[in-house]
Design a protein with these regions (language model features):
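C-terminal motif of bacterial Sec signal peptides marking the signal peptidase cleavage site
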Residues: 17-20
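Bacterial signal peptide processing site
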Residues: 22-24
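Soluble metallo-hydrolase cores and metallopeptidase-like ectodomains found primarily
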Residues: 36, 119-154, 207-284, 295-307
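Noncatalytic luminal/extracellular "stalk/propeptide" segments of secretory-pathway proteins
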Residues: 48, 52-55, 59-161, 168
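Extracellular/luminal Protease-associated
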Residues: 125-217, 401-404
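Acidic/histidine-rich catalytic neighborhood of metal-dependent amide-processing enzymes
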Residues: 169-176, 257, 279-375
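Active-site-adjacent substrate-binding region
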Residues: 359-488, 567
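C-terminal non-catalytic alpha-helical accessory regions
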Residues: 464, 474-720
């Protein structure tokens, strides 16, 4: 998992969930055949088994690459872990396959940093970049402060090792620090966190995906280790030897997605239950606990004697954290390869994916949450409020129960790759609180993601909740994927003022689509109601099978429509914000208008945050912010890996999701310079912004027209 914000409890509360749930005493209120199936599963599922799997994956040295941990894309440790997971799946009784997919291989074996004249000997953590030879790099260590362009002024770093403080939460991702060091001729870069991540303590080393070309060794140390180095440099001991034993092989690695199949009565459809098993450090929560949960759910179903209607595939994906060099879309590579190259046919037959990330820590939330694509929000509400299949959270760990209001998914886990190919999905949510006291900023991708964070109650609650959800999905013949939610998103996304004369055709097409979506939803509901009536009347198996066959036929249309929605309407701003495609242009037009208005008033910055430089950073989804601290060359290098024009065939799940960026950066850079010189003439900058705003308006109108045409086509698809 890449980056999301969650809240952590204090240490005392964290200790409470360590005790295992003595027995799963979960109860449900529903009656009937589905209820009996869920009850049998709840009686059989074993939280302790999930913990044992997670602990083994996180701490057994046989499945780790070095003393810091690490199990990365295509590494020996990842291969060993795949075999272990496959063996466990076979022991459970699943049909097992290790599916090979191509990734960039990265194996981090070891690293050391020594300073001459001192006893400093540090083991840094390496990013997914090239290493050194066995002798390493011996060079002067130069402190470049916060690692921005201005920090290199007056410093000769040619052929030297630079030391930079980074904040990847608030300021910039590691690729910009890396490219800035490359621009100035450094031989390697050592980073430490000054804020954002790794706030648990100054002893924490943080690791992230690199989102860049492999240009030089890049490693991370802790803030306390930095202070040792800074004191040594101040004392005149600045000659360092950095050795990084990394094995990097672009497009020559193999990662294994381990699949355990629980065969259904029909193999025409399937459900996927998944987590990923590659890790930074020990990765206890992220994502060893998820693999434990996936296997425990499988074992619970098998042990309960559950016979699914559809195949249920339990999958441990590799190469989620990182799997490809030279792209901003370098995570969830194993999953992307799976659904696009290894098994593209899954896109038309997978009725749902249930993915897991960090599923066993207590976040302090009063209410548990389920995240899903918007089209599953109605199903989630029904499952929580009226199905009677949902057990209460274990030991009231979430005192207000599970929320019926779902949360939209994001791009930070394997579901994004499957969604882009037309697979709708769910994912657990540990919580959504933000801030430096939150779990993500404190422990995420550090050694503090450890077993001390384990909550048996949360693990058991997730096993109960999502196991019941999987059975509910499996037992329901017509997939209740509600395209009314698509219509809601399309309506909410449109600024009718900016859309101008294209607004009414868009809204007319949307009205027609909403009518078709509602009719489709009613057809789904009718089949499911007929099936429930047949169950209540104890109908024979032939009657039930005939209804299920009608449901499967309708599901084909439903999944085709969902895939069409992903292809035609869903865009991604930068790599993080999932939006309706025209919103990228709409936002730019709006922001640039504000920048121009501020410049016409002569205001660069003010307390209200409405000055030109207070706003300009938001252009292109925040990509413009890079110019505030880094050189134009560094920003160009980062953006080159983001866009299809400059990086064709290497955007993975970002393919066809981006937009044409506004070329406003010359004006923004000029404003930053004038802010220092107090030059108040902004005529040239206004001209640049106005030109780019007009271009973004043209792109906006064209995209709105395309979406209007697509709505009409989707209406016809649903009516066929």
């Amino acid at each position: 998992m890449k980056n999301k914000m969650w809240k952590l409890l204090g240490a005392a509360l964290l200790l409470m969930p360590l005790a295992a749930c003595e027995q799963n005493e979960a109860q449900i209120t529903a009656q009937g055949e589905q209820a009996e199936l869920v009850t049998a599963y709840l009686d059989a599922v074993d939280e302790r088994y999930a913990y044992e799997i997670a602990e083994t994956l996180a701490y057994d040295p046989a499945y780790l690459s070095n003393e810091l941990g690490f199990r990365t894309a295509g590494s020996d440790a990842e291969h060993a872990a795949a075999r272990y997971i496959a063996d466990e799946m076979e022991e459970i009784g699943l049909e097992v396959e290790q599916v090979p997919v191509t990734v960039d291989r990265w194996q981090f074996n070891d690293a050391s940093l020594r300073l001459e004249g001192t006893d400093i000997d540090i083991m840094p953590a390496s990013y997914a970049t090239n290493g050194t030879d066995e002798d390493g790099i011996t060079a002067e260590l130069v402190d470049v402060g916060s690692g921005g362009a201005a920090d290199y002024a007056g410093k000769d770093v040619e052929g030297k090792i630079v030391l930079a403080g980074v904040d990847q939460w608030n300021e910039a991702w590691i690729d910009q620090y890396l490219h800035e060091a490359e621009l100035h001729g450094a031989a390697a870069i050592i980073t430490y966190d000054t804020g954002g991540y790794a706030t648990y303590s100054d002893e924490m080393i943080n690791m992230q995906d690199v989102c860049a070309e492999d240009v030089m060794p890049c490693v991370s140390i802790s803030a306390s280790q930095y202070r040792q180095l800074a004191e040594a440099i101040e004392a005149g001991n600045d000659m360092a030897t950095l050795i990084v034993d990394n094995e990097m092989q672009e497009e020559q690695g193999t990662s294994y997605n381990v699949v355990g199949r629980l065969k259904g009565r029909s193999d025409e459809q399937q459900i996927i239950v998944s987590g990923h098993y590659d890790v930074y450090f020990n990765g206890f929560q992220d994502d060893s606990c998820a693999v434990g949960l996936v296997l425990a759910m499988a074992k619970g179903m098998v042990d309960s004697g559950y016979q699914p209607e559809n195949d249920i595939l339990f999958i441990a994906h590799g190469a989620e954290e990182w799997g490809a060099s030279g792209t901003q879309f370098d995570w969830t590579t194993g999953a992307w390869e799976m659904i696009n190259n290894a098994h593209p046919e899954w896109a038309g037959k997978t009725i749902a994916m249930i993915n897991f990330e960090l599923p066993a820590f207590y976040d302090g939330m009063s209410q548990g949450q389920i995240s899903c694509v918007p089209e599953f929000s109605t199903l989630t509400k029904t499952f929580v409020e009226t199905s009677g299949l949902l057990a209460e959270p274990v030991d009231a760990i979430y005192p207000e129960g599970i929320s019926a209001e779902s949360v939209d998914t994001n791009t930070m886990e394997d579901g994004v790759s499957y969604r882009a190919s037309g697979v709708p999905y769910f994912i657990n949510i540990p919580g959504t609180q933000e801030g430096e006291k939150g779990w993500i900023q404190q422990r995420y991708h550090t050694v503090a993601d450890d077993r001390d964070t384990y909550s048996a109650q949360v693990m058991q609650t997730n096993l109960n909740t999502f196991g019941a959800l999987a059975i509910y999905l499996d037992q329901t013949p017509a997939l209740a994927l509600d395209l009314n939610a698509t219509c809601d998103d399309l309506q909410e996304a449109l600024d009718t003022t900016l859309a101008g004369e294209n607004a009414q055709p868009y809204l007319d097409a949307l009205d027609a689509l909403r009518n078709a979506a509602q009719a489709h939803q009613e057809e789904i509901a009718a089949i499911n109601a007929q099936y429930q009536d047949a169950l209540d009347e104890k109908a024979d198996q032939q009657t039930l099978d005939e209804i299920r066959e009608r449901g499967r036929a309708l599901n084909v249309k439903t999944l085709d429509a969902f895939r069409f929605v992903q292809e035609q309407f869903i865009g991604i701003i930068s790599t993080s914000d999932i939006v309706i495609k025209h919103v990228a242009y709409q936002n730019n037009v709006d922001v640039i208008e504000g920048v121009i208005a501020a410049l016409e008033e002569g205001v660069l910055s003010n307390e209200e945050g409405s000055g030109a430089l207070d706003l300009a950073w938001m252009i292109n989804g925040g990509a413009e912010y890079g110019y505030y601290s880094f050189s134009t060359e560094t920003n160009a290098a980062s953006l080159a890996t983001l866009q299809e024009e400059s990086n064709p065939g290497n955007l993975f799940w970002g393919t066809d999701k981006g937009s044409v960026l506004a070329q406003t950066y010359p004006a923004t850079v000029s404003l930053l310079e004038k802010a220092e010189s107090e030059d108040g003439d902004f005529t040239e900058e206004i001209a640049v912004y106005a030109k780019e705003q007009a271009q973004q308006e043209r792109y906006l109108q064209e995209m709105i027209r395309q979406e209007t045409d697509a709505m009409q086509e989707l209406t016809q698809m649903l009516g066929a």
